[in-house]
């Protein structure tokens, strides 16, 4: 049974690709049609490929794998942090620092500095220092927290990386490839899918689309770690029943697209 229904994908605007002039021809197999200058993603394929991604992440989590969630674009930042945290995993939701994976030892020294600064604040060290020095240390801590807070407690290089918009996160993609770390990613119609191990064809610009798919990847981690989540299964079953009533075919989706521009912002 599908972990996400056609109805859920449609309501979140997952089917909206980019403008036809901004496409990557390698995404052609995942495109259903074109409407009003926008490519429409084939949601029947997306449903199946989300299932594959879900099972891939679930199996990795069941083997005690470390999953890193990555999404630094504005539309993804909140979802990436919230869902990774909910799943007990790790995230990068601001600028990816070059060498985060390939120069892990150096990154660890910066993380140690972050932890030291937190300890200094907690144990009262700051109270014994000049205000000007404390101000500088606080700024340093805030900067380190912003870029490294999501991986502060990551025990090792991740076993799987989930990425929102690999086109934007090219440095992360290259580092993962160099270290042979599998990449699961939301891939829009303007992106080269060849760089990704497990593809989820989808709109990667709409906040609702990003949140929906990111939350399902978090669900996969939770299920892998704790066993099958009955609530998730029951909700999926209910959603699929509802979907049969409202979305019978891709033609229904195309009809829904006509005149609907809500999910095409920033395209």
Curated annotation (Swiss-Prot):
GO cellular component: cytosolic small ribosomal subunit
Biased composition (Basic and acidic residues): 235-244
Intrachain disulfide bonds: none
PROSITE patterns in alphabetical order: RIBOSOMAL_S2_1, RIBOSOMAL_S2_2
Pfam families found in the cross-reference section: Ribosomal_S2
InterPro entries hit by this protein: Ribosomal_uS2 (IPR001865), Ribosomal_uS2_bac/mit/plastid (IPR005706), Ribosomal_uS2_CS (IPR018130), Ribosomal_uS2_flav_dom_sf (IPR023591)
Region (Disordered): 224-244
Keyword entries, A-Z: Ribonucleoprotein, Ribosomal protein
GO molecular function ontology, one term from the record: structural constituent of ribosome
Single biological process term from Gene Ontology: translation
Family: Belongs to the universal ribosomal protein uS2 family.
Name assigned to this protein: Small ribosomal subunit protein uS2
Organism: Lactiplantibacillus plantarum (strain ATCC BAA-793 / NCIMB 8826 / WCFS1)
């Amino acid at each position: 049974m599908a972990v996400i229904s056609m109805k859920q994908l449609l309501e979140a605007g997952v089917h909206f690709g980019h403008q036809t002039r901004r496409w990557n021809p390698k995404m052609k197999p995942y495109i259903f049609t074109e409407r009003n200058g926008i490519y429409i993603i084939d949601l029947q394929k997306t449903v199946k490929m989300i299932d594959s991604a879900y099972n891939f992440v679930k199996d990795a989590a069941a083997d005690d794998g470390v999953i890193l969630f990555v999404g630094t674009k504005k539309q993804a930042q909140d979802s990436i942090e919230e869902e990774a945290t909910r799943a007990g995993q790790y995230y990068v939701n601001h600028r990816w620092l070059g060498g985060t994976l390939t120069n892990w030892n150096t990154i660890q020294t910066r993380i140690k500095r972050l932890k030291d600064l937190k300890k200094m604040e907690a144990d009262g060290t700051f109270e014994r220092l000049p205000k000007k020095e404390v101000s500088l240390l606080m700024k340093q801590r805030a900067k380190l927290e912003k870029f490294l807070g999501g991986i502060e407690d990551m025990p090792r290089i991740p076993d799987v990386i989930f990425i929102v918009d690999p086109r934007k996160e090219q440095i992360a993609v290259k580092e993962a490839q160099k270290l042979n770390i599998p990449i699961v990613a939301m891939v829009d119609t303007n992106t080269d899918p060849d760089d990704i191990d497990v593809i989820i064809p989808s709109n990667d610009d709409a906040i609702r689309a990003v949140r929906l798919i990111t939350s399902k990847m978090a669900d996969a981690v939770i299920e892998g770690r704790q066993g099958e989540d009955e609530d998730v299964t029951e909700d999926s079953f209910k959603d699929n029943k509802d979907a049969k009533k409202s979305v019978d075919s891709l033609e229904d989706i195309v009809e829904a697209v006509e005149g609907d521009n809500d999910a095409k912002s920033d395209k």
